[in-house]
């Protein structure tokens, strides 16, 4: 019984990770999956774009088009250089799909085959930083985005938030007495948010997390 409870909790945690970007809240009775229970970061960004809160005119979009092996490093560096000087003096995070992280590695290998400077080479460091930023921009590879997504988001770590009612909610499952069957009940209250979309602290490249979203 203890093993089964732990297994269920582990599965719930694994299901939550990819949903952080792709989840879309739906209150319909037939929508009961984790991906229907809250708005993920990608959904929040898409809604803000539709509302005009994320736009080139607002200064928080640097259009890159679809990334390629030949240009991804240059395009990402352009995003960072677009930001105000005060932002560039701070440590920031660059959120990418896993596949785009791999594409960046390929670009780096092509452009800088003999560079092994600290905080620069993907093969030399435990943390990967965007080349040309002097270690100011850490690349964060994110689960839950489609492989063909060219999405990129640059901001401060503290600007991206998630929260739950109590952290213990995701670690608590109560068994319910029942004959011949194992039943258990659990609950969670979870949500994601971007604190501000102001161009001084936030920038995206105009691509949706899910390329099929229009």
Please tell me what each predicted stretch does:
Residues 1-78:
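Alpha-helical scaffold segments that mediate packing/assembly in large oligomeric complexes
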Residues 2, 90, 178-182:
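Residues at beta-strand starts and edge strands
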Residues 8, 94-97, 139, 184:
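Short low-polarity hydrophobic stretches
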Residues 12-19, 99-111:
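Charged, low-complexity, helix-prone segments enriched in Lys/Glu/Asp/Gln
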Residues 18-28, 88-92, 119-122:
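Short glycine-rich, low-complexity/disordered patches
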Residues 36-70, 102-214:
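Sequence/fold signature of self-assembling virion shell proteins
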Residues 70-107, 118:
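C-terminal interaction module
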